[in-house]
Structure formats: structure tokens, C-alpha cells
Amino acid sequence: FLFFAIITGAIGHVIWNALLKKSEDKIKFMRAFTLLSSLLLFPLLFFFEPLPRTAWPFFFITIVIHVFYKIFLCKVYDYSGLSFGYPIARGLPSLILLLLTPFVFGENLELNNKLSVIIISLGILLLVFSEGNFKKINIKGLTYSLIVALIIIAYTITDAKGARASNALTYLLYYFSLDGFIFNIIAPFIFKKKEIHLNYFLKNFKNISIAAFFNIY
């Protein structure tokens, strides 16, 4: 069951990234589906224990980090295709975190776990070379992909510490329940002409709904 959940979760992640890449205005689409994700999950907060005080510092830090993650991920897809930007942004962090784990968490993974991470990460990174993408590297796309990779490392470490300071499920629920609201409060101050209205939701309802579902899957 765990293997199935991991695989379907990974596929879902690719799906909402593909829909983001396909969207005409990526910031608007990001605002829309993250807002819908939070609207769907927020009522569940009333059925879970409150997030412990020890976890709130990590929660606030990860919310800020994720604002930058969303902005730069949109930039990635403005300048590069899914088959180029996604493998770099998602493949590199796992390899770097593998090296950082003993220093950050004081833990050493077993050899078979290390090999699994290396094989999967290299498999993702090799997708960059599909369709001859190495011949048409966009420097801006590459730069933004590397920035996103660093951001993913930062929020992965922060979330791991936050989950350890609380219940992992509660921590994730709080994040997904509030993330969309917070991003939509902050985004208008950064992007003056990226308002989203009801007609935008209605026009793109199918893709927004699919992305929202797989975002919280």
C-alpha cells in the first residue's frame, strides 16, 4: 500500500505540474488551485488537534519558503518545458538531501535506502536528456530550476523538523489548509495585475479542480 501511495502521489505531482505548465497565466493558475485546495481541507482542521506551539515556528518558515517556491516554479515553466525544468527541480534535491541528512538530522540511511534514492533521483534527472533537451538548454529556465531545487531542499528540511515537533498528519493538514489562503493574500502585493475572479474559476474549473486534488493528494 505504501509503495502504491508513493507512486500515485508522484504521478499526481507530475499532473498538477503539467497543468501549471499548460496554463496561460501560471501565477493566476497557481493562486486558483492552491486556494481551492485550502478551501477543501480547511473544514477538517476542526476535527484535528491544534498544531503544537513547538511546531509553529517551522510552520511559518515553511509558509514563507513556499511562497518563493510557487513564484519560482512558475518562472521555471515560463522559460522551460516540463521535461526539462521538472527533472532538475525534483531530482537534484533528493541527492543533496541524501548528503545533508547525517548532518541535519544526525541519521545515517542504510545502504539499500541510499541506493534507492540515488537510482530514483538519477532516473528523474536523466529525463532532462529526453527529446534532445540537452541541445536547447534555456539558461533562465536552468537557473530558475536550480533555484527551485534549493528551495525544495529548504522546505523539506523545515517540514521534517516541523513534523517531528508535532504530529506529521496534523502538520501537513495545517499547511495545505492555510497555504492557499496565505499565498492569495500575499500574491496581489507582488503581482499587481494577477487578480483572479469567479469567471476565471468557471472558465478553468476542470483543470483547477484536478490540480487542487492532486496538490493535496
Give the ranges of each region predicted by the language model:
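A helix-boundary/kink motif common to multi-pass secondary transporters
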Residues: 25-28, 81-82, 105-109, 167-168
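Juxtamembrane helix-start motifs in multi-pass secondary transporters
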Residues: 29-30, 85, 171-172
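Membrane-interface interhelical linkers
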Residues: 1-64, 70-82, 129-144, 177-216
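Residue-level recognition of pore/gate-forming positions within transmembrane alpha-helices
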Residues: 10, 34-38, 90-95, 117-120, ...
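Alpha-helical transmembrane segments
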Residues: 58-65, 107-121, 167-180
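Hydrophobic transmembrane alpha-helices of multi-pass small-molecule transport proteins
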Residues: 38-41, 98-102, 112-131
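Selected transmembrane alpha-helices and immediately adjacent juxtamembrane segments
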Residues: 140-170
